[in-house]
Amino acid sequence: MNKKVGLWLDRNKAVIVSIANNVEGKRIITSDMEHYILYSTVVPGDGSPENIRDRRFWNHLGEYYDKIIAHIRDATEIQIFGPGVAKHELQKHLEREGLMERIDSVEDADKMTDLQIATRVQKRFPIRSRFDLSGMNASSPTGRE
């Protein structure tokens, strides 16, 4: 199966648009990072509060990227875009997983609606309409010679 994936992400949310067999699908993954930061606690005796909070932050972020990778692992081509550093952090996680060669592009993008994200992915990986007869031989009604 030839699955192509485009995804917009920041540290709070990832919108994954996948195209396989000319069918498009969408999945949203959230990190719950805002909730995590607001309500994380530090237990006395575990070390400095800043170090513990930082370690927990990076562990939580790593789990978020692992969830994303689980949904895009079988893609043959991956387009990554979004604001900030999250796209580069995900790229490093993909490198560690041995998926670097599947990355088609890593691009900057501002906040986008789900429709804008889907449109951008469709432009990068066009879906061939089932009514597109351009691949058929015009002299034969069945497309075969």
Predicted features and spans:
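Terminal alpha-helical anchor/extension segments at protein ends
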Residues: M1-E145
